[in-house]
């Protein structure tokens, strides 16, 4: 992935394209991202992402695309203004390669956040307090490869349970 050559049409198809900001800043120090698209459930804020990455030393501008740059990310104390899952993920992925310690307060703590932290630790990251709303991340210079099994999607599981209850059906 080249940080300034992302396909605008693909980025506009998914809201999650904003999740490229943290890892690309950690990897290359730059990202030019066409505006994310995807679902039309409602307005999706990205300012929590921008403010958190800014605390780590990233600069941000907007002119038809989001432009993030950070020659060197540095650890910081960050209070997320909302416990956003994607902003927490973005901040974690940037902070693992930032120089020094990062403390993320009001972090989302959903199971997939915990699994992301466990996976990154397997790759050589140093993330503590996994599962809490305050994460402590000591940045590392390098990550390495590894294998990780992702657990079941708890939202999908509860959807099936709810459907069975409403229809008085069974789950097999």
PLM regions: where:
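Structural preference for solvent-exposed beta-strand-turn elements
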Residues: 1-172
């Amino acid at each position: 992935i080249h940080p300034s050559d992302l396909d605008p049409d693909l980025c506009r198809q998914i809201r999650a394209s904003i999740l490229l900001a943290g890892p690309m800043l950690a990897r290359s120090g730059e990202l030019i991202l066409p505006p994310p698209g995807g679902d039309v459930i409602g307005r999706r804020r990205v300012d929590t992402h921008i403010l958190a990455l800014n605390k780590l030393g990233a600069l941000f501008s907007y002119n038809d695309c989001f432009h993030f740059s950070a020659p060197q990310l540095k650890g910081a104390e960050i209070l997320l203004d909302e416990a956003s899952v994607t902003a927490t993920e973005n901040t974690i992925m940037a902070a693992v390669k930032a120089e020094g310690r990062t403390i993320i307060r009001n972090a989302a703590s959903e199971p997939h956040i915990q699994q992301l932290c466990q996976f990154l630790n397997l790759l050589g990251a140093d993330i503590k307090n996994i599962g809490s709303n305050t994460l402590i991340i000591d940045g590392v210079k390098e990550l390495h490869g590894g294998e990780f099994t992702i657990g079941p999607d708890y939202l999908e599981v509860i959807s099936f349970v709810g459907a069975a209850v409403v229809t008085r059906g069974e789950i097999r």
